């Protein structure tokens, strides 16, 4: 079923799942619920990652495909992750688990960007996605 979703739809799914996960995590759920939240993390990561790959495949010229993926990895796994971890750690130290709610902000920004992408992007054909 993922093959039927556009890059923007996958990014929207990932952003929505991330907002839900951070919001629920901030409520200090019981241990058993954290397992379900980690599954939601897997869904939000996978949807976002696949959404980017499909977006790049459709939007980035072939000769820059590796560069596009490298920039995404450097930003998402490096700079942005380091900043998010530092900010989250600061709020966690002061607010406990409620500090995780601050992570809703970057997730919401990503969701807003994905919705904007959905509104301005052309729809790739099924052949272009596969």
Model-found features: residue ranges?
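MFS-fold secondary transporters
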Residues: 21-25, 41, 114
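Structural signature of the two symmetry-related core transmembrane helices
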Residues: 9-24, 104
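Helix-loop junctions at membrane interfaces in 12-TM secondary transporters
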Residues: 26-37
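Helix-to-loop junctions at the C-terminal end of transmembrane segments
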Residues: 1-7, 92
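A late C-terminal transmembrane helix in Major Facilitator Superfamily
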Residues: 66-95
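Intracellular juxtamembrane helix-capping segments at the cytosolic ends
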Residues: 47-61
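Intrinsic disorder in cytosolic terminal tails and internal cytosolic loops
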Residues: 117-130
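Symmetry-related core transmembrane helices of the 12-TM Major Facilitator Superfamily/SLC fold
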Residues: 99-118
